[in-house]
A protein has these predicted regions:
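A generic local structural motif
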Residues: 4-7, 32-33, 105-106
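Short beta-strand segments
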Residues: 15-50
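Short, structured beta-strand-loop surface elements
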Residues: 51-124
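Extreme N-terminal tail/first-helix region
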Residues: 1-16
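Generic alpha-helix detector with strongest preference for long hydrophobic helices that associate
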Residues: 8-9, 18, 35-42, 76, ...
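Solvent-exposed, well-ordered amphipathic alpha-helical segments
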Residues: 13-14, 32-34, 81, 123-124
Length: 124
């Protein structure tokens, strides 16, 4: 079902599986992946499982922070967005415990060191 403004706002209040489309940093072609977002204190974040190598989606956003945030649950919408990459340790330590709890993880230090983390700034 296409999203009304109220339905979109309601969908953004809770984390869920979405897709994002970034522009390939080398190819210039759109790259769409499935990922989960989190609403933490009214802000939208995307993270991932910790690992030392940076994900392609994050490298793409470092090259061009504009992307499309695709709601795809009960509400469908393609939302223009900009990524704010979060590298600063203190901010990561404030945000990632929420993600760790949602995923029932107990490796916060590894997440702070290795998990990708962006804040999603919707262009609305």
């Amino acid at each position: 079902m296409p999203g009304t403004i109220d339905a979109i706002d309601a969908a953004l209040e809770r984390g869920q599986t979405i897709d994002i489309t970034t522009m390939g940093r080398r190819s210039g072609k759109p790259r769409r992946i499935e990922i989960v977002f989190h609403n933490i204190e009214g802000r939208i974040y995307i993270s991932g499982i910790p690992r030392p190598q940076k994900r392609d989606w994050l490298l793409n956003l470092e090259a061009d922070p504009r992307f499309t945030f695709h709601l795809k649950g009960r509400t469908h919408a393609d939302l223009a967005a900009t990524a704010r990459i979060i590298d600063e340790e203190a901010e990561r330590r404030r945000i990632l415990p929420h993600v760790a709890r949602a995923w029932r993880r107990n490796d916060l230090d590894a997440m702070v060191r290795y998990s990708p983390l962006i804040e999603v700034l919707l262009d609305r």
